[in-house]
Amino acid sequence: MPIHLEIVTAERVVLSDDVDMINAPTKDGRVGILPRHAPLLTILEVGELDIVKDGVTTPFAISGGFMEVLPNRVTILADTAERADEIDEARAEAARRAAEQRIAERKSAQDLALAEAELRRALVQLKVAQLKKIRRERD
């Protein structure tokens, strides 16, 4: 018995499908969601969102948002959400370098916080893109 998942950003519906399991990065740590899970509303962190369907894990890079869990449905409202094959590694690497440079400059506390958030997002994108390469080489 699968659970219906919708991942939505301001720009688009990223995914609408029945899945077997969801593993999400929340403010309180990683949370695994299976069908008939207890209702839950939680804040999502920047991180890797793993979706399992038919024994295959598909990683997404998300940059925060909210997750509503009902017994047979999960809705994720994400700031951004990208599948591994949607990530431009060169762009993510450039964003990582730019964020590290801004952190080194330490212009203001606000700029530092924004640069750290950009760095976390770029690192997650790079990790998810690498996972796809590793899985492709393994298969």
UniProtKB/Swiss-Prot annotation:
Which GO cellular component terms, listed alphabetically, does the Swiss-Prot or TrEMBL entry include? plasma membrane; proton-transporting ATP synthase complex
Fetch the InterPro entries from UniProt: ATP_F1_dsu/esu_C_sf, ATP_synth_F1_dsu/esu, ATP_synth_F1_dsu/esu_N, ATP_synth_F1_esu_C, ATPsynth_dsu/esu_N
Q: How is this protein positioned relative to the membrane?
A: Peripheral membrane protein
Q: Does the keyword Transport apply?
A: yes
Keyword set includes Cell membrane:
yes
GO molecular function of the protein, one example? proton-transporting ATP synthase activity, rotational mechanism
Q: What function does this protein fulfil?
A: Produces ATP from ADP in the presence of a proton gradient across the membrane.
* Subunit-level organization: F-type ATPases have 2 components, CF(1) - the catalytic core - and CF(0) - the membrane proton channel. CF(1) has five subunits: alpha(3), beta(3), gamma(1), delta(1), epsilon(1). CF(0) has three main subunits: a, b and c.
State the family named in the UniProt similarity comment for this chain: Belongs to the ATPase epsilon chain family.
Q: What name has this protein been given in UniProt?
A: ATP synthase epsilon chain
Lineage runs: Bacteria, Bacillati, Chloroflexota, Chloroflexia, Chloroflexales
